[in-house]
């Protein structure tokens, strides 16, 4: 019996430990700034029991209702084979509603994702600057070097991204677990001094706060958005853990530690109002302060690294779903494909971080520019979830819809309370999001138009093969593969090959690689083959958006299904379109020029599908768009 209890205890601790870095490391540094920043917005909040108890009550119930009930109970149940995130939710919702509304859902999903991108690139700056500014309060000489130190840390952080392997996750999880325990212990000191602070859990203090400060009270959410928006990144990463593991680690470890610390800070501010500028480190004993500063910097780097990893993952997902051009993606771990590194995204975000710090300079200004994109994304997540549950027949349907409607109303007020940030610098992430959206929609629309343009005169494959018999073309030994982007259409590469070379191989494969909405495709459903006439074969390979197509794997399944193929005896014919700008209105001409630029800088099928370079024959085709 004792052995069973020990195993259960060990299992519980392992659950917390395994999720702590990936899911909750992002929120780890927030106790340093969340309380003090709630008071510095010049909204007339007095440093008294009413304000302190009220703000603590708001933090507690907001985290409970939005992060725990909304996300960890309801939203995580809406997933695609365990995968979450706004793109996944968009895809699931689009399937549930009528086709006329699908376009609107997709556009809203893309807009929210891009705006969220614009916001989350600010979080690393906030995490790192918050710690350095706290250090400068105790070590005044640091104040002159905040900018230089921040840039140095960012340079180090972005430089090591390619070196970080999945195996480091255990080290990061251990450090963040220790940090959360330390955060809780620091808070306990304040609670011990004034235990009455725990009464702030009572929602009556929240109500009294809103009664007294009226509309101004909502502006507290301008700071709290930093805490609650982390739930969107948590939703993106749910695929690596079970729902029960995520709920346990939040409810029994992370949430209590954060709230204990917040209550401790509230207690010390009530007793020593002068500590409002640095309540977190005010609770730390003098002898432990240097260690805590050092540890906090390390945690801020790990927290920032998690943000960057989430950005890499979202980018790869967008690439695989066809919303971004093919770009170089490196897998830094042989064990799990989630640990990836994307050089161009890494350095774009590094440049963005440098610009942020250069323009906005301090923590308060950085917090002022954060929140618009996040709350829009959170509201759309709620809206999409409402549509999902409305179409789904299940238990407690009415209760779920009522709860989500209530949350949507609350999020509307949070949006209003953050809207003033647009004139305070909030335009920065919005502009970034608009640029990102423009790139995504341009690539998706123009790629589709290009496919239509290059295939609109094509006959069906079977008719094409039938007509080839009349030409009596010379046949040579070996196998040729022609990449096809659309079903039942003739690849341009074979048309140009026949036109210029006037020969065909004995075995000809029309290969169509499809990316499905699911994260993974079962191995037994990976490849479908169709035997056509005259030595022609049709092959369709299916991959999930989390998987990377591999020509060797496709050939392996083809061999199992009856086509004898050898990569080193196969020639791959790939079309290389040279795009020329045709006559268009000026606004469409700008979009076309952007597409031409993206197309020229995107990677071709050779890299995308790991095709051996010495087996590739590229055929240049000039296309007017």
Curated annotation (Swiss-Prot):
Membrane association type: Multi-pass membrane protein
The reaction(s) catalysed by this protein are: K(+)(in) + H(+)(in) = K(+)(out) + H(+)(out)
Gene Ontology MF annotations: potassium ion transmembrane transporter activity; symporter activity
Keyword entries, A-Z: Cell membrane, Ion transport, Membrane, Potassium, Potassium transport, Symport, Transmembrane, Transmembrane helix, Transport
Kindly list the residue ranges recorded as spanning the membrane. 15-35, 58-78, 103-123, 140-160, 171-191, 218-238, 251-271, 282-302, 340-360, 366-386, 396-416, 422-442
* InterPro entries per record: K+_transporter, K_trans_C, K_trans_N, Kup
Q: Where in the cell is it found?
A: Cell membrane
Where is it predominantly found?
membrane
Q: Which GO terms describe its cellular component?
A: plasma membrane
What superkingdom does the record give?
Bacteria
Which protein family is named in the record?
Belongs to the HAK/KUP transporter (TC 2.A.72) family.
Q: What does this protein do?
A: Responsible for the low-affinity transport of potassium into the cell. Likely operates as a K(+):H(+) symporter.
Return the protein name. Low affinity potassium transport system protein Kup
**Which species is this record about?**
Wigglesworthia glossinidia brevipalpis
Name of the coding gene? kup
